[in-house]
Amino acid sequence: MCIRDRGKTGVVGLIRGRDGGQSGRSLGLRADMDALPMQELNSFAHASKTPGKMHACGHDGHTTMLLAAAQHLARQRDFDGTVVLIFQPAEELGGGAHAMIEDGLFERFPVDAVFGTHNWPGMAVGDIALSSGPVMASTNEFKIVIQGRGCHGAMPHMGIDPVPVACQVVQGFQTIISLSLIHISEPTRQAE
């Protein structure tokens, strides 16, 4: 079964195990699938064929891994319960997961747990990293408004110049403790 339009462009697929899903157990596997508004500048065989769109963060790989898992599970069905395949849009620009949840993803397809994956180009081929809880960092947007006050050029002491204040804010960001700490631990190495 394949359901489209969860979170506008999300897709959900179901694969039932050898028991036809009767055990009631359900596991979600999730991959992000959005492209970024960037021009691909390489000539790899897997390069984007759509001008101005690029899977720069490996989302094409994430989607491929989930499709490969789906193919394997559909062929083997050597499990009990149901696997819910979640193809999430808008991961990079935010809101895709939230939109899918708001559209009733987990009411329609309740799961006991959800697992996701992310490539990590710096890791050796064949190694995997596992962790309970959050693994990758996220970005959050915020807005700072620095408001000055104009004055006559002969009386600068009567005004507030926002430029030096903005410079201090930018320099202050560089001292945030997160820039001094490693935000992720070393990955667990696979046994040889």
Predicted regions located by residue number:
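Residues within well-formed alpha-helices
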Residues: 12, 68-69, 95-96, 165, ...
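Structured core elements
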Residues: 12-14, 28-30, 115-116, 143-145, ...
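Acidic/His- and Gly-rich active-site-bordering loop/insert found
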Residues: 4-55, 60, 64-67, 71-79
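Single conserved hydrophobic/aromatic residue that forms the stacking wall/gate
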Residues: 1-3, 182-192
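Histidine/acidic-residue-rich, glycine-tolerant segments that coordinate divalent metal ions
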Residues: 36-38, 42-54, 60-61, 73, ...
